Amino acid sequence: MAASEIITIPLQLPRPEAEAFAEFLKRSSYDDCLRRSNRRKTYSDSREEVDVMWAGLRLVESQFADVGFAPR
């Protein structure tokens, strides 16, 4: 992750939705991001959108794991 401003996004989910979303995050792949990204978009730190998407997905997954939602 490039050095940038960190933002906080409050999120309130019922437990079943949090569990299902954690599963979704676990099952998402770099290829999923590649298919959905804009191949022409780059960010101010010169990273391609696919790489920023993938990093964001992994960061959200780690935050879920920190509060006990880490599917195997």
Regions of interest found by a model, annotated:
Residues 1-15, 19-72:
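Positively charged, low-complexity terminal tracts
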